[in-house]
Curated annotation (Swiss-Prot):
Organism from which the protein derives: Bacillus cereus (strain AH820)
Family per similarity comment: Belongs to the MetA family.
Primary role: Transfers an acetyl group from acetyl-CoA to L-homoserine, forming acetyl-L-homoserine.
Active site: C142 (acyl-thioester intermediate), H235 (proton acceptor), E237
Lineage: Bacteria, Bacillati, Bacillota, Bacilli, Bacillales
Pfam families given in the database record: HTS (PF04204)
EC number: 2.3.1.31
Protein name: Homoserine O-acetyltransferase
Amino acid sequence: MPIIIDKDLPARKVLQEENIFVMTKERAETQDIRALKIAILNLMPTKQETEAQLLRLIGNTPLQLDVHLLHMESHLSRNVAQEHLTSFYKTFRDIENEKFDGLIITGAPVETLSFEEVDYWEELKRIMEYSKTNVTSTLHICWGAQAGLYYHYGVPKYPLKEKMFGVFEHEVREQHVKLLQGFDELFFAPHSRHTEVRENDIRGVKELTLLANSEEAGVHLVIGPEGRQVFALGHSEYSCDTLKQEYERDRQKGLNIDVPKNYFKHNNPNEKPLVRWRSHGNLLFSNWLNYYVYQETPYVL
């Protein structure tokens, strides 16, 4: 089934070339069916790339989705044209009186700061509080997951001595949770972060369930009561070359960055990346949409 996006959104062409079914709002309004309202709070500086990554995954389901892109009003985005934000994005103030079936909160390159030092923290807190009563289920990704765990449950983050960077093997810890329906017992997911949350802190919160972790990368998937809040510390949405681009960017900046682990063939950055997370990435997003959004949301929000 299609996703509904603005006909002029640049990601639309990319998705159509990949056979992801997208639909204009004009066409969708002629159908006698209610699309799921999904908001994406895009905190990444590379907004267009993140749009394509997430739309690619949520568009690969048999559900019709009405997607609303959000940005932070209290933060000046320097890496994206203001025209793009004006044309395709809304702020929380624009939608705070609406309800949504699902919300995705992305990562952000601010993890070395304390949460309170982030310039849009107060606005983000309002959005996370709003999500508790106005959103059926919220999926938090990477720093967004750290922020959600901290705000909702007081789970802290800790600095890492070295960046967690690469593609890592994870083990399913809860076999019968719907979010992991169809998962292999061992699966891969990318990570790219300078901080971590710790398993002992997660297990110390009775409302939280640890679903999957890695011996090397640590906590990956966590779920709250009734699936209202889902936390993914890794980046299952990443495209094939995202880690490569991050690696090359940091090298160009003169940073001391290691080759991403388990990513390039033979761990050689001159060779092609080896994609081992795509199928489980699709499964993660489709399970979230199906079991925690579509099957739980009321017809009238």
